Amino acid sequence: MTRIIEFSGTVLTGPQTEHHGLRSVDGLLTFHRPAAAPDLVLDGWVIPGLVDAHCHIGLGPGGDVPEGVAERQAVADRDAGTLLVRDAGAVHDTRWIQQRADLPRLIRSGRH
């Protein structure tokens, strides 16, 4: 069964360009209205995902943190709208974050 989500708010597609009527049809975005009614209608603004260009997932004020804390750091970034993180280094391997589809994409740079 096809899942349709309609975003009834404004979509920013450029510095001074707005569109309306964005839909997700089975996860693919389109401005074309499908024949079927939406399963869910969301109101608000749609903006591109954010990039965190300098982050240290897995580090806290005292240095290394447990994996659960590192996960909460990645979730906090995601919940703030960040879809891509440039991780500038951590004590432990954070490669496991890259395997999680529900967390931001991770580009690892620096020492890991």
Name each model-derived stretch.
Residues T30, P38, T94:
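Flexible, glycine-rich phosphate/dinucleotide-binding loops
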Residues G9, G27, D43, H54, ...:
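Divalent metal-coordination and catalytic microenvironments
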